[in-house]
Amino acid sequence: LETEFNIREATLKDVSAISVLGRNTYREHFADIWHDIDSFLNADFSNDAIKSCINSPLSHRYLLALRNNTLIGFAKLNINSELNGMGKPCIELQKIYLKKDSVGNNLGSGLIERVMELASELDSKYVWLDVLKNNVQAPKFYQRHQFRIVDEIPYKTDRYEIGMFVMVKRLKDS
């Protein structure tokens, strides 16, 4: 099992690969919580939506994990994102998506490490995220990386009321 990978920021050349991986991994992990998953995927992972984010580096960033120049995972960040009571500057880790066969190879940890480096470079005081309450493994993963649950918020799909945990990590030098 190959565990070597590298991480870099996305460019416009990566739009299609991000769209395909985002759709596929979301469907693998979360298809059971939607009746009409395609509407969600078409909005969230359209080429136009991804291009818009890549063209707005002061607001959004995609960090890509590649193995042998093939996209195997990514993180999407919202820069200067507000979180109640935390003030700016914060970075929201909006999503980390990994190919199923890449889970457990330190890929997620590598992406988190790069997110923290970028947050430090951008003088952010906190990185925060929200995670589905029914996603049992994800909160544990983030807690291993020193994120802590600070709140619960409602979240609902066209099928279920699920709820989310809000998790925060304070950067060491802030």
How would you describe each model-predicted region?
Residues N69, G73, N106-G108, Q146:
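Conserved phosphate-binding and hydrolysis motifs of nucleotide-dependent enzymes
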Residues G104-E117, K140-R144:
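Conserved acetyl-CoA-binding loop-helix of GNAT-fold acetyltransferases
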